[in-house]
């Protein structure tokens, strides 16, 4: 329903803003080092095109996303089921 879509769009936009604010203060979500917080959150952000919010509107979140997207293990995991998949860029 339109109500449900709008509700969850607002929630997702709020989460983007909170993540962006956090990443303004630190390189990664839990501080200066790459941790399970980043590992668990990145796959959700990798679907940013589905969220229809515009990751490029969040400078710090975009930086974090792109930095993690370049990690060899992340690329390998992203392509695990389909070698032709390309990690979406903002």
Segments and roles (model prediction):
Residues 74-90:
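Terminal-tail/helix-coil boundary detector
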Residues 1-72, 77:
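GST-like fold's C-terminal all-alpha helical module
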